[in-house]
Amino acid sequence: ETEAGYDRSMDNSRMLLWPLYITSFCLWDSLQHNDWHGAQQVLVISASSKTSIGLAYALAADADAPASVGLTSKKNQQWVKSLGLYDNIVNYDALEDIDASLHSVIVDMSGNSKLLADIHAHLGDNLLHCLNVGLTHWSASGSDTGIPDQKREFFFAPSHIQMRLKEWGAEEFDKKSSQFIYDSAKKSADWMAIEKLDGVAELAEIYTDVCEGKLTPERALVIELS
């Protein structure tokens, strides 16, 4: 049975973005549920990743959210700026541009332990909390960040979903999350370039670039298998 309001034209976006933007929704919901952990700014590491962009949509739409700061590579800085979602954008080579006088919460999609350690050193006691989410910098991952255990947590979206299902019920959770995901996916059509690849052979041609992070952030790949 087709779901109510099903839009077939969104099939590719559904495959690409639904699993990511549900995490974005849960991150925003967790942050606001915890009163932003007392932060005055939300630092989003790997700001060009699609899960980060989903979170940025949620933060931009929330009048009560603290300022958002997108951290990204120098090569992606202008592209991230063009999205118009983050209040400020800082590249990894200019961490001193982060306002260290503000209480801060980190949402880390990168898993880059050195980067986290450098940000922690810059912010000092004004780093109040760190949510570890992803591994976009998987080759630089590690545990030596200097951030105390009591200030960091591994964010697992399914656990947050289970909490909200108990509190809200399935219907209310689906209503809130689905509307956010659909609206954000629609907006993403303005920048996302979907590319269809024919089978495993074409996937193999680009697989190394995917692993090495060489794809530009607007690209989104759909592999068609016959």
Language-model features, listed with the residues they occupy:
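Terminal helix/beta-alpha structural elements that buttress the NAD(P)+-binding lobe
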Residues: 1-226
